[in-house]
Amino acid sequence: MKDLLNLLKNQGQVEEFDAIRIGLASPEMIRSWSFGEVKKPETINYRTFKPERDGLFCAKIFGPVKDYECLCGKYKRLKHRGVICEKCGVEVALAKVRRERMAHIELASPVAHIWFLKSLPSRIGLLMDMTLRDIERVLYFESYVVIDPGMTTLEKGQLLNDEQYFEALEEFGDDFDARMGAEAVRELLHAIDLEHEIGRLREEIPQTNSETKIKKLSKRLKLMEAFQGSGNLPEWMVLTVLPVLPPDLRPLVPLDGGRFATSDLNDLYRRVINRNNRLKRLLDLSAPDIIVRNEKRMLQEAVDALLDNGRRGRAITGSNKRPLKSLADMIKGKQGRFRQNLLGKRVDYSGRSVITVGPTLRLHQCGLPKKMALELFKPFIFGKLEMRGLATTIKAAKKMVERELPEVWDVLAEVIREHPVLLNRAPTLHRLGIQAFEPVLIEGKAIQLHPLVCAAYNADFDGDQMAVHVPLTLEAQLEARALMMSTNNILSPANGEPIIVPSQDVVLGLYYMTREAINAKGEGRVFADLQEVDRVFRAGEAALHAKIKVRINETVKDRDGSITKNTRIVDTTVGRALLFQVVPAGLPYDVVNQPMKKKAISKLINQCYRVVGLKETVIFADQLMYTGFAYSTISGVSIGVNDFVIPDEKARIIGSATDEVKEIESQYASGLVTQGEKYNKVIDLWSKANDEVSKAMMANLSKEKVIDREGKEVEQESFNSMYMMADSGARGSAAQIRQLAGMRGLMAKPDGSIIETPITANFREGLSVLQYFISTHGARKGLADTALKTANSGYLTRRLVDVAQDLVVTEIDCGTDHGLLMTPHIEGGDVVEPLGERVLGRVIARDVFKPGTEDVIVPAGTLVDEQWVEFIELNSIDEVVVRSPINCETRYGICAKCYGRDLARGHQVNIGEAVGVIAAQSIGEPGTQLTMRTFHIGGAASRTSAADSVQVKNGGMVRLHNLKQVERADGNLVAVSRSGELAIADEFGRERERYKLPYGAVISVKEGDKVEAGAIVAKWDPHTHPIVTELKGTVTFVGMEENITIKRQTDELTGLTNIEVLDVKDRPAAGKEIRPAIKMVDANGKDLYLPGTDVPAQYFLPANALVGVADGAQIGVGDVIARIPQETSKTRDITGGLPRVADLFEARRPKEASILAEVSGTIAFGKETKGKRRLVITPTDGSDPYEELIPKWRHLNVFEGEQVNRGEVISDGPSDPHDILRLLGVSALAKYIVNEIQDVYRLQGVKINDKHIETILRQMLRKVEISESGDSSFIKGDQMELTQVLVENERLAADDKFVSKFTRVLLGITKASLSTESFISAASFQETTRVLTEAAVTGKRDYLRGLKENVVVGRLIPAGTGLAYHSERKRRRDADKPLRVSASEVEAALTEALNSSGN
């Protein structure tokens, strides 16, 4: 008995470890793992089903088939444990040792490991400095390789074909050694002297000039150093012993009917053993060379197929023509070991069923079918029944439960009390896809779900299913209740706004209840208190919408917690007074004294959470929901065809638009406008018409005429059902109503271009056949997009999670004072995001001063909450430096101060929060939702008319930023720079709006001018790009020869002639090399120079430029001398959005990216080469000029002699993030990427906090490239982890040595995931073979710092409660350490202590 107890004790012992190392196995090591050699290919005897001796399932090698029973049956039972049977040689043990014991095969001839041979870059090839083709020729017995040239003229590693080999034999006899096959490769690898080679390479690299050579050498050097450092020997890449997998991991299962189901590995092993045995026999018989050679080649191929089938040549197929699954296939891909079994396990104690609505539930409850609960909580019920004495044994309890006796239900109710369950809906796109609820037992078979959590789950009740899981242990129940309970997840982790927000019916009910109607029953009455209003309403004496006065008692709780009570009389409506009854004390009456639209309700819940706290908010949300359902029922809102009121003006608007289109058509027919211009104008026309119709329609729908108490006719907001649904935000939008009652508008073709003829009908009138046909494009594109984008979005989320999974908050403060400069985000003149919203929940990095003084009003280190935001807005501060994840200096992980507020909880983030995964989920989750929502507007093209002026929205003072301008003769300014901006500041000096000014814009105001709201302050032509002179003088044409470089056109409408520059490809041969230009000269014909430089004022004209001045004309400063026409635009749609986000995160270089100035200086153009222009920048600091070749077709924004700053745009196009990082630094890159990604999401109305994007960006910026190695061990051009380099540099600086210099590198998320420190994480992501090969060769250690690695090895993740567990475990182990010291050490320490005290 004692033995048994000890045995059970030993079972539970888990090995503690801190890292996992992967390396190459030496032959000795493989033999040490092995329990015997497999000599025969047999598996099991088909009659007895017993394993064959020495075969692949041999019981002597691998252990017994049945527990504690040898094969022949001589020894049975536990008492013989450990005995080895004399007869069959089997050790008596547990059968599960067959899952652990390995065997080996002694190979008759060495075999190269295919991973190290074929996985690029080939490691064997790199070490031997031979090409892969050459090595393969040696391995597969096509050529000889010289191993030892001796005294001959041959070279080591030289390949010889048969003829050359025999010639060499005749010439030199056996002075040299040349062989073929894996033995030759093994010999060569064995002969490599790593230390000598490393020394040689280190000397050779600095002396080499060619880039490619250096790259190749440093690759070899890296590999050699990896081998040296890891203790792997190169010859171990060639196998002499092959390990055999334990038999229970490659089972052979007899099916009924005498057939067997087997793992493919058995076939592959059989092949290897057969060929190996045959080779042994041939060698014993000393068979002819050619036969042996063939057999060796076949053995090599068999081992290749076992390790990685299909990597070389054709895959070996089984009986059913299907390629066999090799060892490599077992671990890679979605069905492989990593993703199928280690990262995605199935769990016990779970069930799933369809969901239905539970409108009567409280927020923390869910309805669980009794049948389901009985099955899920079985063990608990058994225990309870036994404890109560209702059943004597578990077996009896089981019977009771099966019979469903009445006592069982009572016990079930007791077991379930306060035992939370987890509900999950697939796809789980963010952490709110799994939440905990308290179960309520219900009849029926469907799970009931609380309506308010549907938004978090993205669930609806059209047949969705959900899974239920039971947290078993006390700790799990505690975490479920404290962290995952639906009542604790009121705010969304993506943006910190409530996610428990009423939608649809509830919103409609609350909106209906808080609307006011003129002349409703009971209007003008005055009530003493809310109770009286309630009584009168119930008695039917006052209508819900009647305007009344009522006396209320309100308690208002201020931000600092002080409570003020006051009584006042308010003008309100009956419905609002009723609604105020459910509002918690502490909120003012004004929160309900307005029509409750969706935004208002969301704001109300948010305010409630911030002011009165979590518990009250939960109760309030429930009350809101019950009220909303009740009143939407009372309202009786429904849609009928008559609700779609078509505006009377529609016919007129469409008629006038049609006439204008006809006019344009006739202009086109007579050749006055080009095809492109016609297209643009027509589409602009129809867009405007569509907007007019929808304006008229909304005006018509939103108002209705009623008679007031005095009998006068007045207008009030309409009670049209459809309008109410859209206006309240319950369902539908203006765009959809437009299609129902306005006009459908323009449609897009599948390629994204817009069809010129719009659909003028709406759904109420019905579409004609042609119109229907046109609209099928959009509808189908929508559906196809959805299917594709769901997959794409899921993949984006996977990559994001993988790159950020190891980012966890590990300390409170890293102590940096770097940060990002935050300003309000202004776009197209609107403040899209005020400063307050951007800094909310961030920590201030540097003191904020009161504008114009030295007073610190917000000290550094402040976590900005709502109160501080109000304060910052009040003091009209317009820029703040805040801490950001990008600048955090924590080594592993991130610090709480740089991250700021935990958005889902509203306080500073806790240590252990997995902020990386939260960031990835927050960015990935809306991706899927956006893509699932492309087609709601049915492909109706929404195209913006091009902007051609700046009209200010608010009055204020003009500020010009970063603008170079010249003053025209009429006193207006003309912009001559590209990145200029015009801003309007209010009286506090805070910028309210900001506009980009294109080159050539005419500005009618000056810096510091006061302007009124609505004033137009700048104008330009959106369809052309002008060239503006910066000085006055006379025009002379250079190289402008008619019909050679230019052609003259006469405008038929105005009779003026224009000069158009011909495209190079349209010019005759004589004109190909000429560069047409306009030169400025003074009155005497002398060249004029650009102001402040010695560059002649000469403007080169690109192709298709239109020149509007004549030769010899006098012109003034700021006049336009030529225009370059611009192209048309495509529609903006999230379809362009999701790939855009993916491109930004993958840091892809865009096609035809914008060209940025590499240095600051003066622009000049050098000699042209074929098809390219030579751009020369002479730096301002006097260093060497920088030259760059730019293709001719690129349109340049700069002219000769212009000053540019480093990083300024020279040629327009999409920006390349790598260039921004290189030229402008990390902050500029962060600003660019955050804004670009936010633009895509903002277009769809999705809010994501900036810090999530910055968190991902931090992971993309982990690596640096060494530019100078200094005294460090790094090699120039190496990519290293930033933290590693910083630590090394600190060490060097402390020793007064030269530190290494580096540049930051931006990696795309896929690359960043694959280059993480952890090989387990990288291998389970993508390219498993390559990652593992590399890790094994370098002998990598995985310190299990991320979440993924720990999940794979089956431990708690080092985040949240797991982080505490791991740090406690490490602390305990460190505390135990000093006890393990030897006696001599104790003695030495004692004597030392005594001596020191004696002195």
Swiss-Prot record:
Biological-process GO terms, alphabetical: DNA-templated transcription
InterPro entries: DNA-dir_RpoC_beta_prime, DNA-dir_RpoC_beta_prime_bact, RNA_pol_asu, RNA_pol_N, RNA_pol_Rpb1_1, RNA_pol_Rpb1_3, RNA_pol_Rpb1_3_sf, RNA_pol_Rpb1_4
Cofactor note: Binds 1 Mg(2+) ion per subunit.
Binding sites annotated in the UniProt record for Mg(2+): 460, 462, 464
Top EC class of this enzyme: transferase
Cofactor(s) needed by this chain: Mg(2+); Zn(2+)
SMART domains linked: RPOLA_N (SM00663)
Keywords of the record: DNA-directed RNA polymerase, Magnesium, Metal-binding, Nucleotidyltransferase, Transcription, Transferase, Zinc
A Pfam family hit: RNA_pol_Rpb1_4
Annotated function: DNA-dependent RNA polymerase catalyzes the transcription of DNA into RNA using the four ribonucleoside triphosphates as substrates.
PANTHER family reported in the protein's UniProt record: DNA-DIRECTED RNA POLYMERASE, DNA-DIRECTED RNA POLYMERASE SUBUNIT BETA
Family according to the record: Belongs to the RNA polymerase beta' chain family.
Quaternary structure (record): The RNAP catalytic core consists of 2 alpha, 1 beta, 1 beta' and 1 omega subunit. When a sigma factor is associated with the core the holoenzyme is formed, which can initiate transcription.
Protein name, UniProt field: DNA-directed RNA polymerase subunit beta'
Organism: Pseudomonas putida (strain W619)
Gene coding for it: rpoC
